[in-house]
């Protein structure tokens, strides 16, 4: 089936407009889509395809056909990306613009519908003072009244979904293409704005995952044409800007997990970048990290992020002040901003918990490998060399003089908690500060962690002073302002969590309301040292003010204190102890002075040896690295070649599958078209899809031909019946017409005569009037003739010369034209003659070539016929030779049979005593049987069976077989059915005579054996068709094959007289029939 003719884009566009004009927009969209996706459109100029594509985008948006638009846009991108990128940007921008316009229109329509509903509800209120009852609320729920959400779902949501699909389609089309990268980034920004404007959290997650996959596949397809290069600084900068926008939107939508993944993406891109990022971007990065860590309650890294943010602000302020950088590339660093950042750095550092208060992790969670990996990841995200701690953050803050820049209440809070902590007055001092912090919305989030830190400090200090303390006393000490009041349950929960983690060792007696601190001097001292299960503990000897030593510390340091006291006593009591120390010191100095030079030389020699070994090691390492690099290059080259080979094979396999699929589609389309033709008409065949799968095109064509034949026969039958009916009708009409022909003829004559008379009168009357008018006109004109003749003569006289001149010019022009025509005619005749001669020559050459080809073909045909004749003659000779061999074999068999027959007759005529009886196995049916005597002279089975049948005496059974007479055969001999002439062996061949009179070789030999002349031979069976069947009586055998007395043959055998020529079986059968 040939493909449909390809139309020009202009014609397709015109046809689409015509379809739109008759309200056939879906058909127009299908037409445009088929034209764009056609393979022939690849060679069409882009300027002609662009209007078609714009109209297709408009129609697809109007009809919400996103899939058709997607297919067409993919095809258009493949066509135009190598020639004109601007047209792709134009079409894609048009697509998104139209989709966004539809969403805006849907929102306006929803607002109008909602406003009309609200206006209707407001005007239909009967009683303004009546309140809503439960019945009215239920009725409003189940009634048709629409709420705002329902209206949006019905009107706005479908278009929002279509716009989201449009963004995703455009991003997928533009991905990993360096020439379309700007449009890709701008589309991603528009998609982020769409998610933020309409609060589409699910779509935002999918969008982030889509962009992440695009970046991951960029390295995979880096070898393709126009692939993006992430090593390009401009490309990487654009991707960073997109990821920062993604981070901002994630934070605005409060999708903290997605925000954290966006931070990881940004960090990965920053590591790839060779160009340092702008300070304003990094400031945004750290600011978003602070919000993410705060939501995740990771106060340690939250404080570290604030510290990095403050450092970046200070650096930006210095860069701007020195004029080394642009102000637009740096974040604003005014004194107010620096003060706010410093306050948050101190406040977040103070909020880091001293101990862990979570309940989900065990005491050893700090040492878990997963936790270490997580801290390592977070440290890398903050671009820090090592994991931060509470003490390190405070030390860094003091080095930057943050106390001087922070707000006063934050500074006082630091002094109360870290410098001058007193458990009995802590709450009174800190309450006004917490009230100020709680008044600020940004700092209000730190009140709860600050309470945890204060409670930790409180219990640490109380454990150093008291062994037992009343719970009410602890509650009185932990008094906070009213919005942040701590209850007893909160205190108990804090104690239980601290005990569970091993950071506190406190027992609670609810009966007496007393808290008991662990006073066992041999217990662990973990409670006395500030620790944190989150990795945020202070360093050993932290900033917590120690009031006194605990008993456990006293016991643990007892030996150290004893050693120091003994040393001091010996120093002051025993002077010799000091003198021995001085002598030992002087001796050591003398030894060092004496061996200083030698040791110096040894050190220098050792240094030279070390340097030499370093050089050798470096040379060996360089050589090893060179070999490894060479091996690596070879391995990479092999992998690259293997990958290229694999890709080539995959391409070939895809091409083969594509061709097979196309062939299957073509065959399927041909079959469907044929089936469609079969289903048209009154005699349509009902062929289902299952039958279609089992039929090929040849079978379908055969079915179609049969159907056409049936239709043709039906039409011919109908025509025959119709013609017969028309003949009968025409015959009936004519019979009826004959009766009325005479009357009709008379009436027709009368009508014709009346019409003739009427026309004649009118013609005479008109002619008479016309004659009178002509005569009158002649009389009028005759009066003017003298004046006309005079005017004509004068005019001819005046213009005679001009007339002659024009006449001569006309004659010359006529002669010139005649000469030109004669010349053209001669040239034409000459050309025709040459053309005719050329045609004759070509025809002559063609005839000669045809004659040569015909002669060559005739010669080849004759050679082929000769070859066939030789092959036929050879086959005939082989066949004749085979026939002669078969005849010879048959004659030999007949001779053997005759010879056996004569021997059998001789043996039968001999007396029984002189010779042994003839065994059944020596008959004409096969080779002679062996006469094997039984052991001890006993008769054989063959000898015993005949004697038992005739009732022989026991004495006769012991006789030898040679002494017994042959049994008499009284039954009728059985006729052989598998042979025509003899009892055993293959059937005898029916050999026909050549002349019908000459005897065969077998007959001649038989005549010689009987002693008679050959002329007395009887006629053969073959002369009369087929001879009589041979019976067992003729062979001397009985029904069971044993030897019996020979019976006379029913018919005498006659010689056939044939020369022994072989006759095939089919000829014998035809001759017999």
Curated annotation (Swiss-Prot):
Residues 338-522 form the PCI domain. Residues 596-737, 790-910 form a coiled coil. Residues 908-924 have a biased composition (Low complexity). One of its GO terms (cellular component) is cytoplasmic stress granule. Residues 798-1073 are annotated as: Disordered. Its main location: cytoplasm. One of its GO terms (molecular function) is mRNA binding. Keywords: Coiled coil, Cytoplasm, Initiation factor, Protein biosynthesis, RNA-binding. Residues 798-907, 1000-1018, 1031-1045 have a biased composition (Basic and acidic residues). HAMAP family: eIF3a. Component of the eukaryotic translation initiation factor 3 (eIF-3) complex. Belongs to the eIF-3 subunit A family. RNA-binding component of the eukaryotic translation initiation factor 3 (eIF-3) complex, which is involved in protein synthesis of a specialized repertoire of mRNAs and, together with other initiation factors, stimulates binding of mRNA and methionyl-tRNAi to the 40S ribosome. The eIF-3 complex specifically targets and initiates translation of a subset of mRNAs involved in cell proliferation. This is Eukaryotic translation initiation factor 3 subunit A.
């Amino acid at each position: 089936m040939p493909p449909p003719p390809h139309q020009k884009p202009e014609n397709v566009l015109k046809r689409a407009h015509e379809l739109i004009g008759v309200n056939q927009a879906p058909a127009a969209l299908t037409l445009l889509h088929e034209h764009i996706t056609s393979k022939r459109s690849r060679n069409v100029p882009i300027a002609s395809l662009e209007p078609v594509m714009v109209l297709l985008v408009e129609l697809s948006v109007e009809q919400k056909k996103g899939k058709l638009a997607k297919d067409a846009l993919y095809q258009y991108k493949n066509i135009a990306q190598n020639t004109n990128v601007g047209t792709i940007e134009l079409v894609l921008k048009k697509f998104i613009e139209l989709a966004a316009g539809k969403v805006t229109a849907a929102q306006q329509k929803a607002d109008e519908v909602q406003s009309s509903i609200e206006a209707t509800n407001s005007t239909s209120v009967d009683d303004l003072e009546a309140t809503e009852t439960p019945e009215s609320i239920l009725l409003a729920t189940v009634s048709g009244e629409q709420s705002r959400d329902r209206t949006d779902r019905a009107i706005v949501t479908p278009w929002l979904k279509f716009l989201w699909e449009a963004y995703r389609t455009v991003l997928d089309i533009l991905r990993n293409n360096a020439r379309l990268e700007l449009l890709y980034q701008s589309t991603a920004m528009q998609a982020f704005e769409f998610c933020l404007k309409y609060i589409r959290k699910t779509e935002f997650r999918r969008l982030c995952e889509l962009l992440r996959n695009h970046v991951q596949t960029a390295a995979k397809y880096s070898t393709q044409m126009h692939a993006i290069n992430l090593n390009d600084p401009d490309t990487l900068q654009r991707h960073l800007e997109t990821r920062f926008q993604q981070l901002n939107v994630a934070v605005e939508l409060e999708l903290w997990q997605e925000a954290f993944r966006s931070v990881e993406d940004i960090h990965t891109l920053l590591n790839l970048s060779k160009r340092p990022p702008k300070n304003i971007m990094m400031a945004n990065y750290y600011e978003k990290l602070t919000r993410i860590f705060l939501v995740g309650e990771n106060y340690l890294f939250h404080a570290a992020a604030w510290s990095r943010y403050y450092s970046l602000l200070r650096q930006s302020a210095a860069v701007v002040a020195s004029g080394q950088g642009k102000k637009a590339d740096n974040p604003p660093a005014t004194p107010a901003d620096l003060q706010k950042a410093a306050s948050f750095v101190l406040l977040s550092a103070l909020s880091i918990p001293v101990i862990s208060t979570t309940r989900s992790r065990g005491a050893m969670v700090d040492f878990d490998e997963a936790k270490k990996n997580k801290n390592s990841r977070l440290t890398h995200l903050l671009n820090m060399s090592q994991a931060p701690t509470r003490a390190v953050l405070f030390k860094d803050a003091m080095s930057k003089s943050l106390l001087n820049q922070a707000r006063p209440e934050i500074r006082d809070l630091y002094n109360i908690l870290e410098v001058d902590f007193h458990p009995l007055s802590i709450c009174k001092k800190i309450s006004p500060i917490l009230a100020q912090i709680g008044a600020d919305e940004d700092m209000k989030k730190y009140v709860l962690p600050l309470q945890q830190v204060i409670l930790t400090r409180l219990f640490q200090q109380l454990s150093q002073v008291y062994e037992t303390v009343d719970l009410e006393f602890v509650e009185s000490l932990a008094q906070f302002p009213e919005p942040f009041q701590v209850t007893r349950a909160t205190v108990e929960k804090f104690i239980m969590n601290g005990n569970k983690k091993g950071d506190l060792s406190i027992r609670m007696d609810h009966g007496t309301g007393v808290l008991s601190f662990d006073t066992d001097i041999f217990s662990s001292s973990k409670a006395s040292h500030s620790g944190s299960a989150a990795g945020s503990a202070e360093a050993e000897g932290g900033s917590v003010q120690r009031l006194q030593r605990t008993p456990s510390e006293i016991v643990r340091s007892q030996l150290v204190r004893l050693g120091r006291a003994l040393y001091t006593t010996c120093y002051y009591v025993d002077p010799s102890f000091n003198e021995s120390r001085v002598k030992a010191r002087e001796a050591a100095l003398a030894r060092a002075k004496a061996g200083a030079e030698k040791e110096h030389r040894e050190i220098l020699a050792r240094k030279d040896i070390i340097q030499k070994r370093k050089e050798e090691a470096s040379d060996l390492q360089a050589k090893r690295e060179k070999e490894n690099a060479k091996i690596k290059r070879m391995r990479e080259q092999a992998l690259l070649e293997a990958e290229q080979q694999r890709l080539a094979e995959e391409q070939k396999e895809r091409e083969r599958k594509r061709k097979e699929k196309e062939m299957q589609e073509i065959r399927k389309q041909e079959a469907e078209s044929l089936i469609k033709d079969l289903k048209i008409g009154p005699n349509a065949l009902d062929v289902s899809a299952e039958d279609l799968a089992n039929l090929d095109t040849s079978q379908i064509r055969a079915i179609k031909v049969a159907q056409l034949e049936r239709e043709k026969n039906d039409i011919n039958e109908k025509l025959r019946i119709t013609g017969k009916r028309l003949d009968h009708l025409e015959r009936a009409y004519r019979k009826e017409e004959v009766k009325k022909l005479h009357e009709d003829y008379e009436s027709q004559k009368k009508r014709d005569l009346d019409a003739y008379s009427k026309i004649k009168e009118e013609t005479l009357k008109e002619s008479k009037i016309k004659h009178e008018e002509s005569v009158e006109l002649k009389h009028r004109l005759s009066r003017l003739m003298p004046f006309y003749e005079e005017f004509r003569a004068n005019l001819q006289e005046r213009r005679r010369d001009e007339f002659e001149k024009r006449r001569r010019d006309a004659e010359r022009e006529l002669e010139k034209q005649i000469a030109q025509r004669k010349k053209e005619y001669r040239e034409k005749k000459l050309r025709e003659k040459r053309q005719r001669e050329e045609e004759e020559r070509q025809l002559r050459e063609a005839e000669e070539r045809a004659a040569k080809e015909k002669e060559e073909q005739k010669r080849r045909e004759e050679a082929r016929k000769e070859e066939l004749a030789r092959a036929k003659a050879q086959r005939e000779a082989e066949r004749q030779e085979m026939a002669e061999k078969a005849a010879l074999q048959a004659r030999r068999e007949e001779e053997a049979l005759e010879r056996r027959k004569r021997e059998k007759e001789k043996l039968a005529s001999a007396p029984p005593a002189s010779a042994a009886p003839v065994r059944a196995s020596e008959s004409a049916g096969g080779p002679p049987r062996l006469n094997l005597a039984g052991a001890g002279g006993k008769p054989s089975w063959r000898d015993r069976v005949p004697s038992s049948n005739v009732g022989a005496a026991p004495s006769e059974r012991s006789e030898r077989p040679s002494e017994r007479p042959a049994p008499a055969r009284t039954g009728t001999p059985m006729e052989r059915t598998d042979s025509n002439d003899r009892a055993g062996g293959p059937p005898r061949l029916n050999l026909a005579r050549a002349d019908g009179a000459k005897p065969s070789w077998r007959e001649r030999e038989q005549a010689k054996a009987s002693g008679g002349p050959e002329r007395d031979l009887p006629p053969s069976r073959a002369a009369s068709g087929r001879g009589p069947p041979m019976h067992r009586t003729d062979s001397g055998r009985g029904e069971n094959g044993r030897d019996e007395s020979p019976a006379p043959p029913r018919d005498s055998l006659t010689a056939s007289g044939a020369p022994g020529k072989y006759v095939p079986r089919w000829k014998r059968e035809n001759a017999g029939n």
